[in-house]
């Protein structure tokens, strides 16, 4: 029976298979045709892939490579420009130190003394403005320091320009003013019912008060600045004895520089700005940008140049450029220091850097033609203001730092045909970094961290610069930099230590750039033949640390 069972089962399976094929609409001819179609589709796909490869190769060689090469050349040119600008300024500082070209030797300076007959009336009338806006943590320190300045009380007017909208802050300011008035200080508070023009608008309106007309000079101190008692004694004589001097600017020092690593980085950058940029400008050209605070102005020079204007968010720089174009001289005093506080929160620092980069770029856009057609100053000074002061320091350095070191250099791993010379990626940035750290010797060991952090911040500065040049949507955005009042930190400890959630700490832009640089680093590690991936891994880490909120307090 088994002899008949096996053939039967074979026939049964074969018949069932054929029925299933027929039931699904298949046939032996269809199966063969399907095989041919699959082969044809495969060949077509291979052909399309070859065509895509050819198209990509052609696009890469004809479009992408030339464009990328052009961007590299542009960045190399900017590297040379920025390097020589930094070298020039440091050379000027070396000259100042070797030949001891202090302001006291260049300009006339004599100590102010009371006249035997008229008493303190031979002292000029000085107005001190303290602009503030809801800065409850720091205003007491500033008012106390300013009311303690050594100057005849009959020749001094302290003006608190309070734009605060918080009733508690207003009340606190009133209490502080009443306290000092009871001690014989001529201190007043000026308020308005709007915030038109922000800081510039407030100070401009305050200068229209009748009692200001008797004043010769005006000193400006932001709400977190604490001058030493001898500030006016040391600064005002330059204005009294040199009628062509319009501004005397002091150097900032920082009470919370050791708060965290971010404040140490800020100290390095700002020390370079004051000790190198400001002093070289003062020495070589008698011109620099007013820092908005810790300076004394000649009121007549301000008025001749049009006074405060609120057309940009850098009203201080705007005023300085206009006064400088009228032929006035500026004096920077490196040994006269004023204490103040650095922003210790990353968000506050980002807002500050946006304003400090957007405002100058926008002012550059607005004033270029005005500078070119100015007839009061020399061609050399106009060239210095346009090229060195604005283009190199306010535009080129930001574009170079971000686009070259965070975009072009990482992307170069995909274009091995293009060689980026080592002088532009190693020697030039190393020398520029050394120039910067010389202004803060105690932080020399932090130079690597400073470079990586500056590259991260260059993203925000470049964005702000583009908005300023193009007059984008945030061009006139004004956000008061938040300060924690470190001198009062014991009172604020419970508020400062509050932790943000993980989601609130994430900064998406930094994370996205970090992901891109990390991808370039991995590609360079696997396929590259250069050392770049070492730098790229470090830079990606810096973006991730900032992106996930592990910067600042």
UniProtKB/Swiss-Prot annotation:
Its main location: Golgi. Keywords: Cell wall biogenesis/degradation, Glycosyltransferase, Golgi apparatus, Membrane, Transferase, Transmembrane, Transmembrane helix. One of its GO terms (biological process) is cell wall organization. InterPro entries: Glyco_trans_2-like, Nucleotide-diphossugar_trans. GO terms for molecular function: glucomannan 4-beta-mannosyltransferase activity; mannan synthase activity. The chain crosses the membrane at residues 64-84, 395-415, 431-451, 510-530, 531-551. Substrate binds at residues 222, 224. It comes from the Eukaryota. It catalyses: GDP-mannose + (glucomannan)n = GDP + (glucomannan)n+1. It is an enzyme of class 2 (transferase). The active site is at 163, 316. Its EC number is 2.4.1.32. PANTHER family: GLUCOMANNAN 4-BETA-MANNOSYLTRANSFERASE 1-RELATED, GLUCOMANNAN 4-BETA-MANNOSYLTRANSFERASE 9. This is Probable glucomannan 4-beta-mannosyltransferase 1. It comes from Arabidopsis thaliana (Mouse-ear cress).
């Amino acid at each position: 029976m088994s002899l008949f069972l096996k053939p039967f089962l074979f026939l049964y399976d074969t018949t069932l298979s054929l029925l299933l094929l027929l039931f699904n609409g298949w046939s032996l001819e269809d199966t063969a045709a399907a095989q041919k179609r699959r082969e044809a589709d495969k060949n077509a796909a291979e052909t399309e892939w070859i065509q895509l490869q050819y198209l990509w190769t052609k696009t890469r060689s004809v479009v992408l490579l030339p464009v990328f090469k052009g961007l590299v050349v542009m960045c190399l040119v900017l590297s040379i420009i920025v390097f020589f600008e930094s070298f020039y300024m440091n050379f000027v500082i070396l000259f100042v130190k070797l030949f001891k070209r202090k302001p006291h030797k260049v300009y006339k300076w004599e100590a102010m003394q009371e006249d035997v007959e008229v008493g303190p009336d031979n002292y000029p009338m000085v107005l001190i403005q303290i602009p503030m806006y809801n800065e409850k943590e720091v205003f007491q320190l500033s008012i106390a320091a300013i009311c303690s300045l050594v100057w005849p009380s009959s020749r001094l007017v302290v003006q608190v320009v309070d734009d605060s909208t918080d009733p508690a802050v207003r009340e606190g300011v009133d209490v502080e003013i009443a306290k000092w008035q009871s001690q014989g200080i001529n201190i007043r508070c000026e308020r308005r019912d709007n915030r038109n023009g922000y800081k510039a608008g407030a100070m401009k309106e305050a200068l229209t008060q009748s009692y200001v007309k008797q004043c010769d000079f005006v000193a400006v101190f932001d709400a977190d600045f604490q001058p030493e008692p001898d500030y006016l004694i040391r600064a005002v004589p330059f204005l009294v004895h040199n009628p062509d001097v319009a501004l005397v600017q002091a150097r900032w020092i920082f009470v919370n520089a050791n708060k965290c690593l971010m404040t140490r980085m800020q100290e390095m950058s700002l020390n370079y700005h004051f000790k190198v940029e400001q002093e070289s400008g003062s020495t070589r050209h008698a011109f620099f940008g007013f820092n908005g605070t810790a300076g004394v102005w000649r009121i007549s020079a301000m008025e001749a140049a049009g006074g405060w204007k609120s057309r940009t968010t850098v009203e201080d720089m705007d005023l300085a450029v206009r006064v400088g174009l009228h032929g006035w001289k500026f004096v920077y005093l490196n040994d006269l220091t004023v204490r103040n506080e650095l922003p210790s929160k990353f968000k506050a620092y980002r807002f500050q850097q946006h304003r400090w980069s957007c405002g100058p770029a926008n002012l550059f856009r607005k004033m270029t033609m005005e500078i070119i057609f100015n007839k009061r100053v020399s061609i050399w000074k106009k060239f210095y203001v346009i090229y060195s002061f604005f283009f190199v320091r306010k535009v080129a350095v930001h574009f170079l730092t971000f686009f070259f070191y965070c975009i072009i250099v990482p992307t170069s791993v995909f274009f091995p045909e293009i060689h980026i010379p080592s002088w532009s990626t190693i020697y030039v940035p190393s020398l520029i970094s050394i120039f910067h750290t010389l202004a803060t010797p105690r932080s020399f060991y932090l130079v690597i961290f400073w470079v990586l952090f500056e590259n991260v911040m260059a993203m925000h500065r470049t964005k702000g610069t583009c908005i300023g040049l193009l007059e984008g949507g945030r061009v006139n955005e004004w956000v008061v930099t938040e300060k924690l009042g470190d001198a009062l930190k014991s009172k604020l400890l419970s508020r400062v230590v509050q932790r943000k959630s993980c989601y609130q700490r994430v900064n998406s832009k930094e994370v996205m750039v970090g992901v891109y640089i990390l991808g370039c680093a991995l590609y360079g590690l696997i396929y590259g033949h250069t050392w770049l991936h070492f730098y790229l891994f470090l830079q990606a880490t810096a973006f991730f640390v900032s992106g996930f909120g592990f910067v600042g307090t």
